[in-house]
A protein has these predicted regions:
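A conserved regulatory-domain signal marking ACT and ACT-like small-molecule sensing domains
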Residues: 236-399
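Acidic-aromatic/histidine active-site loop/patch
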Residues: 219
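Short phosphate-binding/catalytic loops that engage adenosine nucleotides
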Residues: 34, 90, 224, 288, ...
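Nucleotide/pyrophosphate-binding catalytic subdomain
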Residues: 1-216, 308, 381-382
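Non-catalytic alpha-helical coupling and interface elements of nucleotide-dependent molecular machines
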Residues: 55, 59, 90, 223-227, ...
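Glycine-rich beta-alpha junction loops
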Residues: 43, 175-177, 222-226, 230-235, ...
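Short hydrophobic alpha-helical runs that function as membrane-insertion/retention elements
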Residues: 168-172, 226-228, 291
Length: 399
């Protein structure tokens, strides 16, 4: 007998037929003699619909009340799935995030898990029940409901797998695994049999929507192997693990784009020690995540600094720079995107960057900023060119 954690996204439970499809997958796993914990997201576009409803009431809802509202989406999903499982003769019980033992910090709408009290889950498993848990949510020290942010259900599933020392953690999506690019946008993609935690973490943080990056961080920390599978097609998917069999195989594992990018530029910054700390320290205090940073060569005691952040954080970043750091010559560009290639094989092979740049040159795509690491190369380009860039780079590297 194995203990298996299965997570299903919103598209997998979006309507009655999909719910019963998921119920059959879970029931088959349980009937094979396994203990099963299921983590479920809100149905379809429920979260977006709830956000829209809040917008009908106020343009500035409190983060606490937003968490109270958004957590209701998962509660609908878990109840319906538990009903479907019981209808199939598979004893199941639904638990909210806090009933399942998720405790978080006080960062409403983007809370982090501080601990997981597994007694209730373990008790229900001992009664031979399938435990259906609401992902994305928990309870803080004030006994307030909190949510983990977009993709938080993946993180919930990995946390349960780590805490219970599960034999498997299966993440079911609407695609059949991890591909070298988004198969819905690029025609000649390849499905990966395996990918390392580090490679998957880079792809997830770059906008590949198969797995949430926080869930991959957690899986890497506790060495929880993940299986990415399709809820609609019962074929082998992709295993995410510490070391893969083909470490000396494919140089590049994926090409990804991220359109949630803004480029902020500060002109005429005093070229003196401590200025970078002043700027980015203030941004860090506001929890603004900065990605690529570019500083020009100083002239006449002045320099220019550009950096990227999420588009949704650009307005706050501008306000911090103007009001707290007292910079007046600040501009923002929200027409950008980031395209990246990821692969551990780049560490020991030359010429990969050249091919990436050649692909964009051949398609008249201008590169505005470049960032590199041991396993990643990223370029900031015009957002309108993002899909074309991904396709061209993929063709260059994988054909």
């Amino acid at each position: 007998m194995a203990l298996i954690v299965q997570k299903f996204g919103g598209s997998s439970v979006k309507d009655r037929d999909r719910i019963f499809n998921v119920a059959r997958i879970v029931a088959n796993t349980h009937n094979a003699g396994n203990d099963v914990v299921v983590v479920v997201s809100a149905q379809g576009d429920t979260t977006d619909d709830l956000i829209a409803k809040a917008g009908e009431i106020t343009h500035n809802p409190s983060a606490r009340e937003m968490d109270m509202l958004l957590a209701s989406g998962e509660q609908i999903s878990i109840a319906l799935l538990a009903m479907a499982l019981n209808e199939l003769g598979c004893h199941a019980i639904s638990l909210t995030g806090w009933q399942a033992g998720f405790r978080t910090d006080r960062a409403y709408t983007k809370a982090r898990i501080t601990r997981l009290e597994t007694e209730r889950i373990s008790s229900e498993l001992e009664r031979n029940r399938v435990v259906v848990v609401a992902g994305f949510q928990g309870l803080n020290k004030l006994d307030d409901i909190t949510t983990l942010g977009r993709g938080g259900s993946d993180t919930s599933a990995v946390a349960i797998a780590a805490a219970l020392h599960a034999d498997r953690c299966q993440i079911y999506t609407d695609v059949e695994g991890v591909y070298t690019a988004d198969p819905r946008k690029v025609s000649n993609t390849r499905k990966l049999e395996e990918i390392t935690f580090d490679e998957m973490l880079e792809l997830a943080s770059l906008g590949a929507q198969v797995l949430n990056n926080r869930s991959v961080e957690l899986a890497k920390k506790y060495n929880v192997e993940l299986e990415v599978l399709s809820s609609l097609n019962p074929i082998p998917g992709t295993v995410v693990k510490e070391v893969t069999k083909d470490m000396e195989g494919m140089l590049i594992k994926g090409v990804a784009k991220d359109t949630d990018v803004a480029v902020i530029t500060i002109l005429n910054v005093p070229d003196e020690p401590g200025m970078s700390f002043r700027i980015f320290g203030l941004l860090a205090q506001k929890n603004i995540n900065v990605d690529i940073i570019l500083q020009s060569t100083g002239r006449d005691g002045k320099t220019d600094i550009s950096f990227t952040c999420a588009e949704g954080e650009a307005e706050l970043a501008m306000r911090v720079l103007k009001e707290s750091a007292h910079f007046n010559d600040v501009s923002v560009d929200t027409t950008c995107a980031k395209v990246s290639i990821v692969g551990a094989g780049m560490q020991s092979h030359s010429g990969v960057a050249s091919k990436m740049f050649e692909a964009m040159s051949n398609n008249n795509i201008n590169i505005k900023m470049i960032s590199t690491s041991e396993i990643k190369i990223s370029c900031i380009i015009d957002r309108a060119d993002a899909d074309k860039a991904v396709g061209a780079i993929h063709d260059m590297l994988f054909d």
